[in-house]
Amino acid sequence: LDHKQYLGETLPEIAGEKAGIIKRGVPVIVGPQDEAGLAVMEAKAARSGAPVLAFGQHWHVAEEGGRLVFQDENGLLDLPLPNLPGPFQVQNAGAAIAALRALGRDEAACEAAVTRAYWPARMQRLRHGPLIDSAPKVELWLDGGHNPAGGEAVAATLARMPKRETHLICGMLNTKDVAGYMRPL
């Protein structure tokens, strides 16, 4: 749980704060979610007259055979895997596709979103610059994770990469849960 000082101590409290952006009549896309958090989102959406499109109920996404497979009431999409590394990016891409389809966008728009997404400092491979020039045979990755979920995401991504010697340089504010971030690594 990140930003607890602003959003609340529990998942339902955090979901309630995040549900504050729900607008009347605007579809609410909900990715994989704790049941209590989903219930809060659904209740706020119902009060606001906003339709909910929740993962596992209204749409599904999975990696199958090196592809991203998305399904909702409009049918099945077989797309390339996300441009962004990390197994969690399939879920993120699924939420983006659900939003695009709710807006009436076609398969080409969904594929473009999946293959062109760029998120600096989230498992970003550095390819240019002084650090790369000083060690041209080394892969250098940058990730701005700073909470236990971020550490889990980095660990899951590293687990899918070819095995080799790995060094991690970590820097974050002293208000962050460093031990929680490092635990899965």
How should each PLM-predicted stretch be described?
Residues 1-80, 93-111:
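Acidic, Mg2+-coordinating active-site environments of NTP-dependent enzymes
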